[in-house]
From Swiss-Prot:
GO molecular function, one term: mRNA binding
Region Disordered, residue ranges: 1-29, 77-133, 590-630
Modification Phosphoserine, positions: S132
GO CC terms: cytoplasm; mitochondrial inner membrane; mitochondrial membrane; mitochondrion; P-body
Known role: May be involved in the processing or stability of mitochondrial mRNAs.
Family classification: Belongs to the RMD9 family.
Name of the featured protein: RNA-binding protein RMD9-like, mitochondrial
């Protein structure tokens, strides 16, 4: 094992205030220090921001200055709001320089020894792990091929958080290297071939898990850097690859639990982390519990290793394990080694933050800082981000956020947008202070700058506008004025891109106002932003929020979408295009019908003195209500037998009876069916057409009422524009 420090005990009593300084000027100019009490004071918020909406209140914010200590020691104490501009007193400069030089030498020696230990105890050291294989082995060639495949792991091993000082690193473009994905497929095939051989040892299986995990990272990284979401209608590579990676990880997990293969602690760590990143938290917990409770003592100890427990601790807490049990597991895992493991401490910090045990989290962070060298800054960065996004104490989170933005740490923090979004949601859920939300969004947008990729800015804007429209849902006038100011402000930060307006357009439907939709529509041209097909889909879909939208308006939006679809070279009308039409017509009609029925029932109930003692035949629930009743565990829409019956026409008679209801059928329903019938030749295949008719009717009862009219509808009044790429393939 790699010996990092001479620490065998969990923190007790008051932690030390002197940390090993960083051997560069940053440790002197931007120090941090903890006080033992870690008492937090309240933060007010006041930032100078252009175009601040007139309704915002801007109370004074007590500015925060970093402690003038000459050591890299985080400080969040009682003087958190104090002004202190004397970071380095002149009369202490000589002592500071001497201390800097001494510690630089100390760091050099430690790093050299640590590097040597890392080399001697490499996690994938062939000689130590028994990876050598005789050429006489019948599996020699397949083992060599397997080693060649998993060597791609080294190419993708660095994560975005593992950065040294001010240097940035990014994943390579996975799509630009098809050999990477080819290696994954070949490696899994060779895994199957070698499954029953002794050559498939824990080291080789662990490297394969590492490769699969890095495949997830590469896939996610590529998605984040795309200018637009992939069109899943066209068999998205990213979706297929995610499914393949998940299936492969599950297969290896099952083999581990069944005793067919084994993992080392690195492989187990990557396995649990991969399921966490797939958002399969319960599955990660189940695998870990099964491993530690299984009959294989080796596997049980591997999954109790600090490197693995550090990953599972916060997941366990979020899945119902009590904090005392988390502490006990932390102690048990700590006792398995004789040094302070950063992975374990990071996991305990995150679990403590989730449990609002902030003092414990801060003390562990202090010790993590003390034990960390530049080689281990990735752990500090990850923990710093956790304090921003996961700490429920907004004052603590705000302090860590400010330090990241102000570049006050010796390590360079890549401010990952997911943590900023979590911080925004925590602020909103606790305070409902939209002014504070605005300040964090504005400062984050400035931090990301003009050249940030669309995936990051869109992700931040999506959460921000979720909160914005929730805040102004019932105050359309003030909200629209504020929205105009925000658009101007954002354009000063970076050039507005199409996703920015797409997000606003999709969310402003809460106001049900045609004029606002038209304003956003015109804004694309005003800011010289060419609209992609995504914008045309949202514009059509948004008609479902306008109660007085005419059929002519909806038809025109549909025609615009079809022209754009043809322009970009689509060969058939995509599912996303049909979904936009459905939401503008069928969904609106269903919601309108349900709202009217609800109001009618409320009126009848208010006029009834006593409830009916029993159900009469007239009171018997209709089939769709029977299966959609929340008290009934059967889901009507997902039941395969009922879906098949609907598709076969078994409910046509019922639909005909419903059509004679006294409630009139809305014209949008007829428009939907006429457009579907007129453009049905441009469907991908007959199955797509079936989903648009009988399939959609399963979910929307209003469509059942008119579906029997489909074959007799006259659709000559529905125009088809001149098309060049869309072809009638479904005749």
């Amino acid at each position: 094992m790699i010996r990092l420090a001479q620490q065998t005990q969990v923190l007790k009593g008051k932690p030390p205030n002197q940390f090993v300084p960083h051997p560069t000027k940053n440790s002197l100019t931007h120090p941090m220090k903890f006080n033992g009490t870690i008492a937090m004071e309240h933060h007010e918020h006041n930032y100078a921001i252009p175009y601040t909406p007139a309704t915002f209140n801007n109370p004074a914010l007590a500015t925060y200055q970093v402690s003038p200590a000459n050591h890299f020691v985080p400080h969040f104490g009682g003087n958190i709001g104090a002004n202190n501009n004397n970071h380095l007193a002149q009369n202490n400069s000589n002592n500071s320089n001497n201390h800097h030089n001494n510690n630089r030498n100390h760091h050099h020696n430690n790093n050299r020894n640590h590097h040597q230990n890392n080399h001697n105890h490499s996690k994938y050291n062939n000689s130590n792990q028994g990876n050598s294989i005789s050429p006489d082995s019948p599996w020699f060639h397949k083992v060599c091929a397997f080693e060649d495949c998993v060597s791609q792991t080294l190419y993708m091993s660095q994560t975005p958080r593992r950065q040294n000082m001010k240097h940035h690193s990014e994943h390579p473009n996975s799509n630009a290297n098809p050999l990477f994905w080819d290696s994954i497929g070949r490696a899994m095939g060779l895994y199957h071939d070698l499954l029953t051989t002794p050559e498939l040892n824990s080291d080789r299986v662990s490297k394969l898990v590492h490769l699969l995990h890095n495949g997830l990272r590469a896939n996610r990284n590529q998605l984040t850097r795309m200018n637009k979401k992939p069109d899943y209608d066209s068999q998205s590579f990213h979706k297929e690859m995610t499914n393949y990676l998940c299936k492969s990880l599950r297969e290896i997990s099952e083999d581990v639990l069944n005793g067919k293969v084994e993992l080392n602690e690195y492989g187990a760590m990557h396995l649990i982390t991969a399921f966490k990143e797939l958002l399969l938290f319960e599955e990660a917990v189940d695998i870990w519990k099964a491993a530690i409770n299984g009959q294989n003592t080796y596997t049980s100890n591997i999954f109790l290793n600090p490197r693995v427990v550090g990953v599972i601790l916060p997941i366990l807490y979020d899945n119902g394990v009590s904090y005392p049990e988390i502490q006990a597991l932390y102690e048990k895992s700590s006792s398995m080694i004789n040094y302070f493991h950063p992975n374990l401490s990071v996991g305990m910090i995150r679990a403590s933050l989730s449990a609002s045990e902030n003092d414990m989290a801060l003390k562990l962070f202090q010790k993590l800082c003390q034990e960390s060298t530049e080689m281990k800054y990735g752990y500090l960065i990850e923990t710093h981000l956790s304090f921003i996004g996961e700490c429920k104490d907004l004052n603590v989170a705000q302090t860590f956020f400010d330090k990241a933005l102000n570049d006050e740490m010796p390590y360079k923090i890549d401010l990952q947008v997911s943590y900023v979004k979590s911080f925004l949601r925590n602020i909103w859920s606790q305070t409902r202070d939209f002014n504070h939300i605005y300040q964090i969004w504005y400062k984050s947008s400035l931090h990301y700058g003009r050249n940030v990729n669309h995936g990051i800015s869109s992700s931040l804007n999506d959460t921000f506008f979720d909160i914005f429209f929730e805040n102004y849902a019932v105050d359309k006038m003030q909200g629209f004025q504020t929205l105009q100011n925000i658009i101007q402000t954002y354009n000063n930060i970076k050039h507005i891109d199409e996703p920015f307006f797409n997000i606003i357009l999709a969310k402003c439907t809460v106001w049900h106002d045609r004029s606002i939709l038209e304003y956003i529509d015109k804004s694309y041209e005003a800011y010289h932003i060419p609209k992609t097909i995504v914008a045309y889909r949202i514009l059509l879909k948004s008609m479902g929020s306008v109660d007085d939208a005419s059929n002519a308006e909806i038809l025109q939006r549909w025609m615009d979408l079809i022209r754009k679809s043809d322009e970009i070279g689509q060969r058939f009308i995509a599912n996303a295009d049909w979904a936009a039409l459905r939401d503008a017509t069928v969904t609106w009609t269903q919601n309108d019908r349900d709202s009217k029925k609800s109001n009618m029932n409320s009126t009848q109930i208010s006029r009834t003195a006593t409830p009916s003692p029993s159900l009469t035949p007239m009171d018997t629930p209709a089939p769709e209500h029977l299966f959609n009743n929340p008290q009934n565990p059967m889901d009507f829409y997902s039941h395969p037998a009922l879906q098949a019956a609907t598709a076969s026409g078994a409910f046509d008679e019922f639909a005909a009876e419903a059509a004679s209801s006294s409630i009139p059928v809305d014209g949008r329903m007829v428009l939907y069916l006429k457009i579907v019938k007129r453009y049905s030749p441009y469907c991908r295949d007959s199955r797509q057409l079936a989903r648009l008719t009988t399939g959609t009717a399963v979910k929307y009862s209003v469509l059942q009422e008119v579906l029997n009219q489909f074959q007799t509808l006259i659709v000559n009044d529905i125009p088809i524009p001149e098309l060049h790429n869309l072809k009638p393939t479904c005749v």
